[in-house]
A protein has these predicted regions:
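Hydrophobic alpha-helical connector segments
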Residues: 79-119
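Amphipathic alpha-helical packing segments from all-alpha helical-bundle domains
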Residues: 106-116, 126-153, 161-169
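Hydrophobic/aromatic-rich alpha-helical bundle segments in the mid-to-C-terminal region
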Residues: 148-198, 204-213
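Solvent-exposed, amphipathic alpha-helical segments
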Residues: 19-31, 73-80, 166, 170-178
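Helix-turn-helix
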Residues: 27-65, 69
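Amphipathic alpha-helical interaction segments
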Residues: 19, 40, 61, 128, ...
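Basic, helix-initiating cap at the start of DNA-binding domains
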Residues: 1-31
């Protein structure tokens, strides 16, 4: 009996949290995140402020959960998870036209597919959140990507972190300028950036190998 009651309570918690997150995303179709209020989200979700605070401390906490969800969805659909970051870039170079790269969208890095699901795209289209999301993505991906760049390019952790931040921020800004819509222009830009990133990594690796690092 206790297990049954706990199960019902768990479902109720999930339902309420989903209602809050859906309400926030719905409101962001009309206004930026910084202009939202807890009262407004509660009204849209048809819950009380007390109910909101029983699940979240702030709207920032709701936002973090949504970004995590978007990242997990994108990561789950990846077909190149077993590859290191440099390996993936080299692998993608074989798809040398917009049409072919589009067919292999699932091979792109997670950060390039994080806004593929329409439900979450509004988060990334909000320019007031750009710095916040870029920093969060950097922290999420740093533990796996930075060591791979260090090993491949024969550089220090600090150098690899700066390089990854540069690549992530640049790609994010290009995506934002295209409103995160994956049309022909997006894939053409992605293809060009992919070539620049790969050539850069290869040049640094070659220089350091030649110098005996």
């Amino acid at each position: 009996m206790a297990k049954l009651r706990a199960g019902r309570e768990d479902r109720r918690v999930i339902y309420t949290k989903n209602a809050i997150k859906d309400a926030l995303l719905e409101l962001m179709q009309e206004k930026s995140f910084e202009k939202l209020s807890i009262s407004g989200v509660c009204e849209a979700a048809q819950i009380t402020r007390t109910t909101f605070y029983s699940h979240y401390d702030s709207l920032d906490q709701v936002l973090d959960e949504l970004i995590n969800e978007a990242f997990e969805v994108a990561e789950y659909s990846s077909t190149t998870l077993s590859m290191s970051f440099p390996q993936r870039l080299n692998y993608l170079l074989q798809f040398d036209t917009v049409e072919v790269l589009r067919e292999h969208n699932s091979d792109l890095p997670t950060c390039q597919r994080i806004a593929d699901m329409p439900k979450y795209r509004v988060l990334f289209q909000d320019r007031t959140l750009s710095e916040y999301i870029k920093n969060k993505l950097f922290r999420m991906m740093k533990p796996s990507v930075v060591p791979e760049i260090m090993e491949y390019c024969r550089i220090s952790q600090a150098e690899a972190e700066r390089m990854f931040r540069y690549m992530l921020s640049g790609s994010y800004e290009v995506n934002s300028s295209l409103n995160w819509i994956k049309n022909d222009e997006w894939f053409a830009s992605r293809l060009a950036i992919l070539r620049v990133e790969t050539a850069g990594l290869e040049a640094i690796r070659a220089a350091n190998l030649n110098s005996g690092k």
